[in-house]
Amino acid sequence: MSKPNILLIVIDSLRSDKCISKNLSSITPNIDFLIKNGTVFPNTISSAAATAVAMSSIFTGLPPFKIGMDTINYHRLSPDIETYVKILKNNGYKTHATAPSVAEDFGLICDFENSDSTYRNYLSLFDGLGEQIIEKLVNGSLNTPWFFYMHIFDLHTPITVPKSFSDKKFGASKYEKQISAIDFWIGKIIEKINLKNTLIILTADHGEYVPVIEYNNKIINLEASDNEAKLWKMGNRIPNISPDSALNIKKKIGGLLRNTRAKIKKQKIDELNLSPYQKRVLMESRMEEGHRMFDDLIKVPLIFSGLNIPSNKKILQQVRHIDIFPTIEDMLSLPKKQNVDGCSLLPLMQDKFLKEKPAYIQNPPSIKKNSKKIIGIRTSNYKMIKQADSDKILELYKDRKSVV
């Protein structure tokens, strides 16, 4: 029997509650198709609300502190660390990636074989990227068995919604309209795949705040404007003269955008009597200081579909990012990775008992200097957050309803 292909779709910034829920405003027939023909884990916890940290944990099956990604500053994943991508290569898989350039900045695509493994962060599925992906799937360049890591950046803020999805029927916010737009391309992509011989995994690196709330029967929407999105794209067009210089310029432009947006938001909501949650959603950024371990930022979807995955199954037990590749390893009977903290979720899919494991979480590196390292532990029933160099507990949520 030939080895199955593996397609890992990572939708940057996709929250679990915005694609796996009964009350969605987005139109997502293709994500729904994957769920109907697979198993979904809506309570999947990311290690951190930052691409570099989260993807490093996914690819290694290890928490950030075991792979050198728990520092207060951003840096690259060491090429000496064993990843599941290397294991797949050593077991006959051709490894391909289509990922934003931020993945290259942080050493996430070192083990992929194709020379066009990254694209500029500003490039959308609707700017030709979608067609490039489909061309790879149909032109025979992906020699079987293949592992294809596809990282979609269209939902990353600031969002530019394509005109064809700007109608309110596609979503109650820019964020939700963009999910509808991305779903359109997911449909075009899976049309080109043999689902009987391909394992599809759809997840996100982290979630995001969606600054849209209902207040006194009115909608307050503080999502980034189209002009802000244009400025962000301009910043990402800066050529990589050197990785460090380009990153520094991009950080400065990003900081300018965040500061400007924060001032505008503050002026608009200062006089409103908002709850702490409403203030956080409207005012805070995923890139600001603080622990940034609220569920809006770290709870992501996880869907296994295709191949012989049990159909239309929803498993509510909490699972973790670091469990994704141990599950793939188990499904495909690959040699076991020696150094791993994640565990296979296959027993849950087979209706067997698997004890819930606590999820280690941490704040991502801050864009500001002198930020403090904050860590946490999350289960279904509690979340504990503390400063790494202190015994002082910063936050403690003690029951299921208050874990946020």
Task: Label each residue range with its predicted role.
Residues 1-404:
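Catalytic domains that recognize anionic headgroups
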